[in-house]
Amino acid sequence: MSAEQNHGLEKDVGGPAAPAAAAPNAPAAAPGAPPAGMSAEEHRSRFGYGPLSHVNTKEAILPPFGGEFQPGLYKSVEARKFANPAPLGLSAFALTTFVLSCINMGARDITHPNIVIALAFGYGGLVQLLAGMWEMAVGNTFGATALSSYGGFWIAFAIVLTPGGFNIQTALTAENGDEAMFYNSFGLFLMGWFIFTTIMLFCTLRSTVAFFLLFLFLDLAFLLLGVGYIQRDDAGQPNPPVIKAGGFFGLLAAFAAWYNALAGIADSSNSFFIIPVAHFPWSPTGRARREKTERETV
């Protein structure tokens, strides 16, 4: 076999050809470990595609991955005792956000978001909060902060909308006899979450496109919804076009969350394909790929 054919075979199968015979006393290489003289990051950038591209190996450092809710380089967690909690938290966030965003967009002429209360307490709230706590157990600070916070958001959202016991909306409308104070308060509530989401967004700038888009869409949704409640229409109601725009970006955020969740769940053991996540050119993986291209073109 010629050198050119051998090089093509290496690119197709995702690694260099094995040596004819190993030394009797040589230690066995870890599965997926880079060959001698090649860093783990360069190995992943050159051969990190195909059915095993998202399978965690025993590399010391892994690249950013939204399926693990990791915006930066992180240590391999192959030997952890916990399963990956990120897809659970992402799915809880996605479903609750999807339903509320459809209502905000006026789907099926639904005008009251009361159905979201059950989801916000049970799935988007409690389950996502638990996923955030489990992210603490696996050592993911970003995932723990984000998932726990958005779980708290949904619980707080459900408390605001719950009639009766909490009496929040009634107390805010009792003073002037209209809902202006409640709408202003709720708008400030949403703007606070816009600020928090912007902080989280900054932490995804070196991660993947799919992970970044999740927080970008969510950030725009909070901003537009907050503006819609503060800058109301002539009738004193939340501005319908702005609320619908916020619902649209919320819908995009929900699908982006499901996409990242699927990327974290699908692997060679349960799927015939792997979800692409597209690393930014300035991310660690993107830089390694660019350096490889520059070396090959010299």
From Swiss-Prot:
Which residue windows are transmembrane per the record? 86-106, 115-135, 146-166, 185-205, 210-230, 245-265
- Intracellular or extracellular location(s): Cell membrane; Vacuole membrane
User: Which Pfam family is an annotated match for this chain, by its short name?
Assistant: Gpr1_Fun34_YaaH
Q: Null phenotype?
A: Leads to reduced growth when acetate is used as sole carbon source at low concentration and in a high pH medium.
Q: How does it sit in the membrane?
A: Multi-pass membrane protein
Q: What induces it?
A: Expression is induced by ethanol and ethyl acetate and is mediated by the specific transcriptional activator of genes of the acetate utilization pathway facB. Expression is also induced by low concentrations of acetate or propionate and under the controle of the facB transcription activator.
- UniProt region (Disordered), positions on chain: 1-43
Q: Name one GO cellular component term.
A: plasma membrane
Q: Which GO terms describe its molecular function?
A: acetate transmembrane transporter activity
InterPro entries for the chain: AceTr (IPR051633), Gpr1/Fun34/SatP-like (IPR000791), GPR1_FUN34_YAAH (IPR047622)
Q: Which UniProt keywords apply?
A: Cell membrane, Ion transport, Membrane, Transmembrane, Transmembrane helix, Transport, Vacuole
Query: What is one process in the GO biological process aspect for this record?
Result: ethanol catabolic process
The entry sums up its family as follows: Belongs to the acetate uptake transporter (AceTr) (TC 2.A.96) family.
The protein's role, per its UniProt record: High affinity monocarboxylate transporter (MCT) involved in acetate uptake. Unlike other activities involved in acetate utilization, acpA is dispensable for growth on the acetate precursor ethanol.
Q: What is this protein called?
A: Acetate permease A
Organism encoding this protein? Emericella nidulans (strain FGSC A4 / ATCC 38163 / CBS 112.46 / NRRL 194 / M139)
